[in-house]
Every structure is written in C-alpha cells, then in structure tokens.
UniProtKB/Swiss-Prot annotation:
SMART domains: PP2C_SIG, PP2Cc. Residues 58-314 form the PPM-type phosphatase domain. It comes from Drosophila pseudoobscura pseudoobscura. The lineage of its organism: Eukaryota, Metazoa, Ecdysozoa, Arthropoda, Hexapoda. One of its GO terms (cellular component) is mitochondrion. This is Protein phosphatase PTC7 homolog fig. Its cofactor is Mg(2+); Mn(2+). The keyword Manganese applies. Transmembrane segments: none annotated.
Length: 340
C-alpha cells in the first residue's frame, strides 16, 4: 500500500548541496537538520473550592530542561544532537489518602527519564525501554518512593525524522498535520477512570491489592514527521476537559510557526482554556460524556485536575557536516508502526 505525502519528507530534505574542499578534506554537506521548537505550560488544580484563584499558569521557557511539576503532574524535555525527547507523568492522587505525596513518584520518574535521555548513547528509538530502565531503578532503591503514575514519553530521532512514542495510561500525545490529527495515543484503562500505571507499592503489602502495570504494556509507535507538524504531549487534565476539535482550532494559528515565543503563547492559551473548562459546573466535558457512556454517576461539568501540556513544532535548521551522507534510512517506511 502506497502512502502519499503532501510535503517532502525531512529525510528527502537532508542533503541539499555540497562542495569539494580539496584533497584530504572530503565533502562538506550544507544540510538542514530537523529539530523541535518546544514550550510547556501547566496549572495545578485547586485543592478546595476556595483555592480556584490559585490556578495560576507558570510558563516554562525552552531553556529549562530539567523536570518540573504542576501539582502531582511532572514533565521533562531534553535536546541532544541525536534526539529531542519530551515526557509527562501524572501521579495517582489516591496515595494522598495514605499520607503519601502523590506527586513525588511522578517527579522521580521524570527526573530519571531526563537523565537517561541526556546520555550520548540515547538516540530516541526506544522510549519504552527508557521507561523500563527508569522504573526498574525506582523499584530497586533501598528506600523506594511509594506511589503510582501514568507516563507518556515521545522522542524525535533526527537522523530518521521519526517520532517514537511510549504511552502507559491516560496521559498521551497528539500529532497534528495541516490542521488535522495525524496520530493520537489511545488511553489504557482497567476500567473507567482507572488508568494503567507504574506502581511501587509498600513492601509489606499484598501486590494483588494494587494495579502494578509494567512498562512493557506501554503502547509504542513510530511515526515519520514533516516540517511544520505539531506534537503535543499532555496529562489527562487536558484531554478530560478539552475536546479534540477545540484543541485543533486553538492550535491552527501556529501550524507552520517555528518561533518559540509563538509556541509558548499557544500552549499558554490551551492550558488557560482547559483550566477554565475544568471548573465550569455546566460544561459537558469529555470526561463527563465518558462517565455517562460508562453509566458512572457524575454531577456534570469539567473535571478539576492538574494540567500539563508540552507543545512542539517541527522545524529545520542549517548544519554543516564533513563527509558523505546518506538520506534517512527510514524515509521509505510506513508512516506509522506499532510495536507489540
């Protein structure tokens, strides 16, 4: 089956010109390499009705790469010569009833993902393995951090111009091309409002009491990207409150825009809107509609929750390399591959 592209692939743009530099020097390729222009925004949910005014957004500039958090959500993004990596994690709030900081687990998970993504050997091709290694480290700690978290990590491999994804639970990603959804993650739940989650339970407890899902259960995909594509990674606080069409409309003005300021302003607007909808008592939110579909009593309105959104635009930049280069080996692969 053939797939038509509306634009040339990034791989086909990789080598645009070269010149001879004399004996012993070889060819200098004047090429364009793909990269992601990123911005992040988030809001912590009000912990009581009187704290709604505390839902103030805090923008994070692209230069800030170390993990940050919004309430019990956490995120990171990383850029190396091989890959741009972005991730979000949503700490499971039920641990608060046991006197445990529900956000500490997600923060530790994203911190470890950030450290691994910064390694020179990590090329972004296996974010599911990255999750597995980090989760394994957390379980092996002498005094492990107890808790649970969903996780979504996406990595853009520059040499292939391909986005590799790993999603466990109800956080997720959306890829937008020409104003339409090209690909979107599917949430994983045991039942309504009970997502798959990575868990470190108390050592003296019965493991069967907990939902202890494994990183191997994360859905992994590969998707070829083109210039101007948008990649959004977010926790369920966004998806539970903002329908897909509204999201597309809000991001339509930055399709093809590569200025970091514009990307930041766009993600600010998305989070601000989602936050307002989450505390609207008469709004028919996606969460409310799914509750009705599952015969779950819900009073209606939005779903107050922490909201974290990372938005990126695929751009090109000039780079000079010495030596003969080959076009992307992945340029003739299917646009989307799922790994079992």
């Amino acid at each position: 089956m053939a797939f038509m592209r509306s634009k040339p692939s990034l791989g086909s743009l990789a080598r645009v010109a070269f010149r001879w530099c004399g004996p012993g020097v070889g060819l200098v390729n004047y090429s364009q390499e793909p990269y992601l222009v990123k911005a992040v925004q988030g809001k912590s949910k009000p912990r009581s009705p009187t704290l709604q005014s505390a839902m103030q957004p805090r923008a994070q500039a692209e230069t800030i790469q170390a993990p940050k958090c919004f309430g019990e959500d956490s995120f990171f993004f990383s850029s190396t010569p091989k890959a741009d990596v972005m991730g979000v994690a949503d700490g499971v709030g039920g641990w608060r009833d046991r006197g445990i900081d529900a956000g500490r687990f997600s923060r530790d998970l994203m911190q470890r993902c950030f450290v691994h993504a910064q390694k020179p050997t990590f090329d972004g091709r296996n974010p599911r393995q990255l999750l597995s290694e980090c989760y394994g480290e957390m379980k092996r700690k002498w005094k492990p951090i107890l808790g649970s978290s969903t996780a979504c990590v996406v990595a853009f491999n520059r040499s292939e111009s391909a986005l590799y994804t790993a999603n466990l639970g109800d956080s997720g990603y959306v890829v937008i091309r020409n104003g339409s959804v090209l690909d979107r993650s599917e949430e994983q739940t045991h039942f309504f409002n009970m997502p798959f989650q990575l868990t470190v339970p108390p050592p003296d407890s019965n493991r069967e009491m907990w939902f202890c899902d494994d990183p191997s259960e994360a859905v992994a995909t590969r998707l070829l990207l083109q210039p101007d594509d948008l990649v959004l990674v977010a926790t369920d606080g966004l998806f539970d409150n903002m329908p897909e069409q509204m999201l597309l409309e809000m991001l339509s003005k930055v399709q093809g825009v590569h200025e970091q300021k514009a990307i930041q302003e766009a993600v600010n607007r998305v989070v601000e809107r989602a936050g307002a909808l989450s505390i609207n008592p008469i709004y028919k939110s996606p969460f409310c509609l799914r509750a009705l579909e599952n015969n779950v009593a819900y009073g209606g309105g939005g779903k107050p929750d922490d909201i974290t959104v990372v938005l990126a635009s695929v751009a090109m930049r000039q780079c000079n390399t010495v030596g003969d280069s080959n076009e992307s080996k992945g340029s003739d692969l299917r646009p989307r591959l799922s790994f079992p």
